[in-house]
Amino acid sequence: YVPAKKGYSNVINREENRGAIPPSQGYILVDIRKCQGCTSCMLACTLVHEGVENPSLSRIQIIQNPFESFPDDVTIEQCRQCVDPACVSVCPTDALRANAGYGNVRMIDRTKCIGCGDCIEACPYTPSRPVAVSDEKFNDDLKVRKCDLCADTPYHWDDAGGGPEGKQACVEVCPVDAIKFTTKIPVQEGDEGYKVNLRGTNWRRLGYPIG
């Protein structure tokens, strides 16, 4: 992906927003030792958001490397809903914001997105969690997508439990329970807080969901 118009981040400096953005009230945790690489989560993600099963439109990514050995042959890459979200801070049109109506999840308003790619460049993770794809709903213009914890879908989460059993689509369909949702802020250092052993008693004592 090459940003459509390079230079927005140089023109509009939004660093003053950093630290003033409220933390998300929800996070996705994954256990790559459980993941089988079936991509059910990717298909479910696109089905509930776009109405089609298309991995290219998925907000959660399964990365497979046949040259690696277990458990590094398959990994799950999900948006971290960062406590200090650089993607939100650099968006020049306020298309990417912490949505208070959905627990401050970092969401993209595609009607405001101009496809500049600033959020993709600002994301500290590889592959970047925001993904730019041509959108047929907007004359095939580039629009960015990222995980919104199924906000504004039947699988959204809220204080009342949200969708079916309060589960996001990816959590609901995973056949090996490799994906879990938590309201506790994970450790904000690399993968340590997000890629966890979901069977471990230490996580149960801390109040994290395990399977």
Where in the sequence are the language-model features?
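Phosphate- and divalent-cation-binding pockets in alpha/beta enzyme and binding domains
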Residues: 44-45, 90
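Membrane-helix exit/interface motif
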Residues: 95-98
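Flanking helices and flexible, charged tails adjoining ferredoxin-like Fe-S electron-transfer domains
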Residues: 2-23, 57-58, 63-81, 90-93, ...
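N-terminal cysteine/histidine-rich coordination modules
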Residues: 19-33, 39, 46-59
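Interfacial segments of alpha-helical transmembrane regions
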Residues: 106-108
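Conserved phosphate-binding and hydrolysis motifs of nucleotide-dependent enzymes
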Residues: 38-41, 119
